[in-house]
Amino acid sequence: MLINKWHRYLNMPKHDLGWHEKDLNEEMDELKEAKGFVNIWSEMSDVVYAYTRAKYSGHLKLKLPLSRVQFIFGLVYMLPKYTIRWKFFRKIGKSFDKNLNINEVRNPKKIYKLEDIANKYNLDKEVFKKRSEKLLKRWILLK
């Protein structure tokens, strides 16, 4: 399945069912609170990501909390959104060490998430944030 190949490519860690259920519930809550077409579409893509990641992780009995139309609609937004984020963090990682593969898809515009990622990969937080902010200015699709 194409989605499983994509998840393998991103190489995100697999977690237990409880972790994925919590993640999916949090994304559903954010979707319910979203206002405006683009924000709703973006949050829908986050739900699709959480769901497909859980399925990829082996949790096959998890129920899709969206209609098929919503799923497909979210999928169309999810693939480029998360792939671009992943490529963004890979590029930042390579700026520290050509062998450093940062596998992250979090929103790089949220400073606290940048700090978490820097800690996870044992990188200087301030340098990581500065490089991220500088690169964000050139990556218009992440704005």
Q: What do these predicted ranges mean?
A:
Residues 1-143:
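Flexible "arm" and connector segments at domain edges
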